[in-house]
């Protein structure tokens, strides 16, 4: 059984309504921030489910609670660097499960990566270096106590100013 939750693009409505959590399957996959139509879901406690979440569009832009997810992944080219890097965070509880299928390719077997200290293959050095510089900048721009909270607040302030300018002048579309 698959619960498919999507909005009807033809309706022009950007609101997505999720079914009650207790009616969802044991595995939940979702994209937290869909940029084409401007849909961003809040962090949701899916209660005892395996939760796999694409956070590419909002990774490093606001705090995320890692305890709500089983697997988080983000394509670096959105916010963390340049194309060529995918950042993956896996709850260790999933590692033994991932190795049970002989059909899982080594590149998709997170236990293989853990055993190799995350360098199972030659990484895209330039792309990884770009991510390092981005993280260094984030740390430089904020204090140690609440790094992403500060960047999120700053981004919201900038957005408010831009939307106000758009509304007041009608210049931006």
Q: Where do the language-model regions lie?
A:
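Active-site cofactor/substrate anionic-group-binding motifs, chiefly glycine-
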Residues: 1
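Active-site phosphate-binding strand-loop segment of PLP-dependent enzymes
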Residues: 4-59
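A short secondary-structure junction signal
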Residues: 14-16, 38-43, 61-67, 83-86, ...
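Conserved hydrophobic/aromatic beta-strand scaffold that supports enzyme active sites
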Residues: 27, 71, 85-89
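Conserved active-site segment immediately N-terminal to the catalytic lysine
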Residues: 52, 66-77
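Active-site C-terminal subdomain of aminotransferase-like
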Residues: 76-163
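Conserved PLP-binding catalytic core of the aspartate aminotransferase-like
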Residues: 172-173
């Amino acid at each position: 059984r698959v619960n498919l939750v999507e909005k009807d693009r033809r309706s022009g409505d950007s609101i997505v309504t999720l079914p009650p959590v207790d009616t969802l399957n044991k595995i939940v996959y979702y994209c937290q921030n869909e940029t084409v139509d401007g849909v961003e879901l809040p962090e949701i406690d899916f209660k005892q489910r395996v939760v796999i979440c694409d956070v590419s569009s909002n990774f490093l832009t606001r705090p995320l609670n890692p305890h709500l997810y089983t697997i988080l992944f983000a394509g670096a080219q959105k916010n963390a660097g340049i194309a060529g890097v995918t950042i993956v965070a896996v709850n260790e509880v999933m590692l033994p499960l991932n190795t049970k299928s002989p059909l899982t390719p080594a590149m998709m077997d997170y236990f293989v990566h853990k055993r190799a200290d995350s360098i199972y293959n030659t990484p895209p050095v330039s792309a990884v270096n770009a991510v390092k510089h981005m993280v260094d900048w984030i740390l430089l721009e904020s204090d140690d106590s609440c790094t992403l909270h500060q960047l999120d607040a700053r981004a919201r302030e900038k957005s408010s100013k831009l939307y106000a300018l758009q509304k007041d002048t009608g210049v931006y579309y």
